């Protein structure tokens, strides 16, 4: 098959209308706006109502991305949904396919937690580069508010809900300049949303386990240490693969986990603060949605312009982390 280039030609985003401010969280747990904002940079987060679904947020973001790419849903060959919180554990990408009317698209979910969008970007690129598909819709979406313990101030202050989407298309020149992906399962226990079940005897001498997933648990200090060390390293590796220097980067777009992490990574890479894209003050950590949501906002605000070089990195549970260097537009 012919190897082709890829371009990111459209973006979109969606978030619930309901906002929860730091001051309101102090009614739930022992905290304050100052405590949260100084440690995380977060001031509010969006929360999905019981009537809202992951697929509805994802579809809204997708419609924007498809429109901005100048194509129709019927042009989409593949839909990749990066999420850890599907409407249906068997997968939600096909539900989005139906909502969009993308009748010819293959659709499946991809789970890599907060790294999901970057892992999905690289996965989508392989389908295009090998000539299998021409138009791919990549979505990052999560509703983690449904999976946090709202009495645990270590986690409930961090997460918000949202969705972001991009369209990738085959292109004469390759706009994905370089990437690197990593995983380390030995550190899985630092951040997880683990299954917790109870043994039940269904017949004599035959036991099964039934249960559900426990809320998000996290060792914040270890996750910070991991991100501060591994994210600059993997961005450097992706830059090497792209054969460009850090000075050529127009924008640093990291997973929006914590402002301290964003600042630390930028400092270690010697990237000035004005090149760092951050919107977590308004959305919190939206997991797989954070990068495409921030990307879309920056494009719509006129910050990111055609041909800008963007260094992006996702990192989180697994533990997983990855980086991609790409140019915006064709």
Swiss-Prot record:
Signal peptide (UniProt feature, chain positions): none
Gene Ontology molecular function, alphabetical: 3-oxoacyl-[acyl-carrier-protein] synthase activity; beta-ketoacyl-acyl-carrier-protein synthase III activity
GO cellular component term, pick one: cytoplasm
GO biological process entries: fatty acid biosynthetic process
Keyword presence, Lipid metabolism: yes
Catalytic machinery residues: 114, 255, 285
Keywords, comma-separated and alphabetical: Acyltransferase, Cytoplasm, Fatty acid biosynthesis, Fatty acid metabolism, Lipid biosynthesis, Lipid metabolism, Multifunctional enzyme, Transferase
ACP-binding: region residues: 256-260
Domain of life of the organism encoding this protein: Bacteria
Subcellular location: Cytoplasm
Notes concerning its domains: The last Arg residue of the ACP-binding site is essential for the weak association between ACP/AcpP and FabH.
Subunit structure and binding partners: Homodimer.
Protein name per UniProt: Beta-ketoacyl-[acyl-carrier-protein] synthase III
Naturally occurring in which organism (per UniProt): Trichormus variabilis (strain ATCC 29413 / PCC 7937) (Anabaena variabilis)
Gene name tied to this protein: fabH
């Amino acid at each position: 098959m012919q190897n082709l280039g890829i371009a990111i030609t459209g973006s979109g985003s969606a978030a619930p209308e309901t906002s929860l401010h730091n001051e309101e969280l102090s009614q739930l747990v022992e905290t304050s706006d100052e405590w949260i904002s100084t440690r995380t940079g977060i001031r509010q987060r969006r929360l999905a109502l019981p009537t809202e679904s992951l697929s509805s947020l994802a579809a809204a973001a997708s419609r924007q991305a498809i429109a901005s790419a100048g194509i129709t849903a019927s042009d989409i060959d593949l839909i990749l949904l990066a999420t850890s919180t599907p409407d249906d554990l068997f997968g939600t990408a096909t539900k989005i396919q139906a909502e969009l009317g993308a009748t010819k698209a293959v659709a499946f979910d991809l789970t890599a937690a907060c790294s999901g969008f970057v892992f999905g970007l690289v996965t989508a690129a392989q389908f295009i580069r090998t000539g299998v598909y021409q138009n791919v819709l990549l979505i990052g979406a999560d509703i983690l508010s449904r999976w946090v313990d709202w009495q645990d101030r270590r986690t409930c202050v961090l997460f918000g809900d949202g969705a972001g989407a991009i369209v990738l298309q085959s292109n004469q020149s390759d706009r994905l300049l370089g990437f690197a992906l990593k995983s380390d399962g030995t550190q899985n226990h630092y951040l997880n949303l683990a299954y917790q079940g109870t043994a039940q005897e269904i017949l004599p001498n035959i036991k099964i386990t039934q249960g559900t997933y426990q809320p998000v648990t996290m060792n914040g200090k270890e996750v910070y240490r991991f991100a501060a060390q591994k994210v600059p390293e993997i961005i450097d590796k992706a830059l090497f693969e792209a054969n460009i220097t850090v000075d050529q980067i127009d924008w640093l777009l990291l997973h929006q986990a914590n402002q301290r992490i964003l600042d630390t990574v930028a400092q270690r890479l010697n990237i000035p603060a004005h090149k760092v894209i951050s919107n977590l003050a308004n959305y919190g950590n939206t997991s797989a949605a954070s990068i495409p949501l921030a990307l879309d906002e920056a494009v719509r605000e006129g910050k990111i312009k055609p041909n800008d070089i963007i260094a992006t990195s996702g990192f989180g549970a697994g533990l997983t982390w990855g980086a991609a260097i790409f140019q915006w537009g064709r």
